Amino acid sequence: MPKRTDIKSILIIGAGPIVIGQACEFDYSGTQACKALKEEGYRIILVNSNPATIMTDPDLADATYIEPITPEVVAKIIAKERPDAILPTMGGQTALNTALSLRRMGVLERYNVEMIGAKAEAIDKAEDRALFREAMKKIGLDTPGSMLANATEIKDEDRKRHEAKRAEVKAQFSGDELDKALDKLETEWQLGEVERKQRYMSHALAKAAQALDVVGLPAIIRPSFTLGGTGGGIAYNRQEFFEIIERGLDASPTTEVLIEESVLGWKEYEMEVVRDHADNCIIICSIENLDPMGVHTGDSITVAPALTLTDKEYQIMRNASIAVLREIGVETGGSNVQFAINPANGRMIVIEMNPRVSRSSALASKATGFPIAKVAAKLAVGYTLDELDNDITGGATPASFEPSIDYVVTKIPRFAFEKFPGSSPILTTAMKSVGEVMAIGRTFQESLQKALRGLETGLTGFDEIAIPNIEEGDEKNAIRAAIGTPTPDCLRMVAQAMRLGLSVEQVHDASKIDPWFLEQIESIVKTEERIREHGLPQDAENLRMLKAMGFSDARLASLTAKDAEDVAKLRADLDVHPVYKRIDTCAAEFASPTAYMYSTYETPFVGQPRSEAEVSDRKKVVILGGGPNRIGQGIEFDYCCCHAAFALGDADYEAIMVNCNPETVSTDYDTSDRLYFEPLTAEDVLEILRVEKQKGTLHGVIVQFGGQTPLKLANALEKAGIPILGTSPDAIDLAEDRDRFQKLLIKLDLNQPKNGIAYSVEQARLVAADLGFPLVVRPSYVLGGRAMQIIHDERGLQAYLLDTVPELVPEDIKAKYPNDKTGQINTLLGKNPLLFDTYLTEAIEVDVDCLCDGKDSLVAGIMEHIEEAGIHSGDSACSLPVHTLSPEIVAELERQTAALATALHVGGLMNVQFAIKDGEIFILEVNPRASRTVPFVAKTVGTPIAKVAARIMAGESLEAAFDAYGGKPQPTARPHIAVKEAVFPFARFPGVDTLLGPEMRSTGEVMGLDYDYALAFAKAQLGAGVELPREGTVFVSVRDEDKERVLGPVRKLASIGFKVMATGGTQKFLEANGVESTKINKVIEGRPHVEDAIRNRQIHLVFNTTDSASAVSDSKSIRRATLMQKLPYYTTMAGAESAAEAIAALKAGSLEVRPLQDYFRS
């Protein structure tokens, strides 16, 4: 049937900030949905709190709300916009849960809003563990033996009482009075949420105890309606069982967990299915997990298509997945169904399904070229699959054709355990990865080895790895333990075990990885041994065969004690180069006009390898992306790359994107003119450029927008004679090189904190003695503040040098100095020295984003950090415009920024970080590239500064580039205030201290917008998941130098009814200054103490600042308790002041919602 005409406007709910389990893939799906529905003529209303997304660009939707994604806030948007329909399937678990809450609150009914894409009943049936189990039983599909722990009975009673009150209100009032009365009733219901949750948890815990006797141990615990396995896990003993149950019940919005029999070691598969109103169902892609059951699919290495199923097994699974969609009632759109198969007897069970587009949907879309989100959006408004064209084949096939692929795709997740000292790297059913890489090859081996080097963790392939505890004598058991424990390094452990003599059968017994995959890895390991023994082949045929197995030049070089350049030269001499094939959805059955490509060294049975690159004769620019997401380098850089592609297209260049991240908008087939899905290594990029230079004109390469990843390639590209657009690699090096940068600052008469540089352990001690404590230390050339720390004393310095720095030593240096820790460190520091700075206490940190064309410059935004200097800028909340700085300071910041931009001959973007102490300005660092604040600034000032920067880099003047996008921004004309807040994954890493420092640990960000600073801050907190209390008790414990300053926020809270609780010294000070407060013990002073009060929910807000290292350690348990109880916790005075202002503003009146477009119009 054609599209629906009874719907005029559609509300799309985004996914909010990037968190573990919900990343860029929902910006990709949301962006596709916005474009697809807007081109059909619908009015699009979008809500998303994440400013770093493409979907929140003001030209993508008609009304773009950068507001917190909570049911209460979205209800206000619905009341204001009155959409006809709501599409909740594009924003992950956040959107689904919000839509269901809106339905339960009666908002959808009140405003006559229809849920499209997935009905509420279908979402409930898929996400509610009990309903799903019953549905599977009904259609004859097996599920794991399981029992539920929930509080359904008492919840139903509460809900009935609430519904009865709603009916009374409806009978009593009408019109505006009815709306007010219903809002009041809902507010009262929300205020009782904490008390109800406690009752439900107690009831469900009792049920869990009964379930344990039936299901037994080990048991898999899966909370309902959660994201990425949040709160779940595998329990091997009773203590673990009740810990995970409590965590899972707390994480589940419905206070329900499923307790399943153990299926550890079974094989895991996924099916991506699309269905339309006419019951046409197609399988987009089958996905197989290399890791057996027990590891969350988001943390598993996966391949597409599934490689170890027989055709019969595949057909059974295919039919089963379609039956699941029909029974659950997913009428339109994409869904993901997960299966497990017992390899011992072939028993197949259904694990779960997602009735929405998901992380796997994004992977399947990129793996096949089939745009699941775009098609799902069109199906939601009435189209059927046969009415839609397949874009990839240029309409030669309809969307109802099942994709067929003639290559293998491998996805490997990327982790960040090094950012969370004390966290366990063991993988379970709760997702922990922060990003992923995807690689494509004609064979599994080629695809796998490309993915390994695409991870950007320093691997060149199956690099050697040390087996833990192997030196303790029991070699066989140490190896079995290493390969039997799921960790990020498990696959390399498997290869190492084979090098040490274990057979495929022995490795399979320990790891439960399918023997077929192990045979492929064994083949690579045996080939490596032959290369070590005989060297590289000197003929084209045999060298091409090695490359076809996925070996990188760097890996071949390390196996033969050569340089990668030597291998590249041998390849060039023998004319061994990759060819480029197209992703066409149809295994080359139809010609594809879409330039979506991957490289392969395939060796055909006859003839020469054929390239499908079809290079154009246009003027072209290559944009290098950021690779897999990681902490410190995420969606913000992908946003910049996308904007560069859009801007270059506007300027009539052919935009060519190179990236390997399947989650992102940059790897969508229609973001750029040509897309190469390839690892971002010098070898892979230079091969692409070799092909692209064969026709047309290569204007240059952009390395400035993808974070540290492309910057690392700048020297190799320059050495190869490739033109680099924008700021020169030498200027980038000047800003990174401490000695050269210091000379530049002296020349410009600009300040920086007293500092030093150390090329050895001994020199580090001397520099620290010269500077004095406290000081900041960091390795050179890092992004996200990796291994950056504030050192308070000699003991801290010793721990840093002997514990932290060794973790940075690469494997090749460790191998060179196996038993010499100091030798390893000094070798590392010889190339990458340690940088020391005096730590500026009590300083205000400022971020400045600037554009420059080499001569003229313009400051786009000056952001004042709410956290003091010393906390990584990526983890700090900040405001734009500045909140407390004087106009004179702002003018001086602009002058110094302009001086730096001109001196560095910046072409494009530059970010400068300043610290202001006692009115004096210090430069902390300069980054002559795009920074992670670019999207936030662009959304605040209303100018697409990344697009402007790309035009400047292509050769336009600052003036002309701005004119192309509506002229220069006018900061003084902006009455609104934006606050950015960071979002952290601490709940995923039990035992990790939540105290912030100079090493970045946030995964995402949100933005609060308002005309009032306090309300903008409140929105940012709410968007980040921090529920600011309107009443209750504030706990205060601050260091002596903060006592005077804490009086303001505490008095403000006391004046609006808050009780105050404080530790000894702080409580005496507050009482002496007229603030009534109650004394409570510190943790070290005996019980009952502050942690008990937090856990007993007697405290609702925490202000806690510490100075010495021991005080930081003492307060760790308080920080952990506040995290587990989801309490707002502020560790700086600026944060406490802002929180008090925000709470007072919320108490005075409710939040108002406005679209971004209104802010710009005003």
Curated annotation (Swiss-Prot):
Boundaries of every MGS-like domain copy: 1026-1162
Binding residues for ATP 2: R778, T838, L840, E845, G870, I871, H872, S873, Q913, E925
GO biological processes: 'de novo' UMP biosynthetic process; glutamine metabolic process; L-arginine biosynthetic process
Chain positions recorded as Mg(2+) 3 binding sites: Q913, E925
Annotated region described as Carbamoyl phosphate synthetic domain, given as residue ranges: 614-1025
Reactions catalysed according to its record: hydrogencarbonate + L-glutamine + 2 ATP + H2O = carbamoyl phosphate + L-glutamate + 2 ADP + phosphate + 2 H(+)
Binding residues for Mn(2+) 4: E925, N927
Pathway involvement of the protein, from the record: Amino-acid biosynthesis; L-arginine biosynthesis; carbamoyl phosphate from bicarbonate: step 1/1; Pyrimidine metabolism; UMP biosynthesis via de novo pathway; (S)-dihydroorotate from bicarbonate: step 1/3
Job description of the protein: Large subunit of the glutamine-dependent carbamoyl phosphate synthetase (CPSase). CPSase catalyzes the formation of carbamoyl phosphate from the ammonia moiety of glutamine, carbonate, and phosphate donated by ATP, constituting the first step of 2 biosynthetic pathways, one leading to arginine and/or urea and the other to pyrimidine nucleotides.
PANTHER family found in the cross-reference section: CARBAMOYL-PHOSPHATE SYNTHASE [AMMONIA], MITOCHONDRIAL (PTHR11405:SF53), CARBAMOYLTRANSFERASE FAMILY MEMBER (PTHR11405)
Protein name: Carbamoyl phosphate synthase large chain
Organism, scientific name: Brucella suis biovar 1 (strain 1330)
Gene: carB
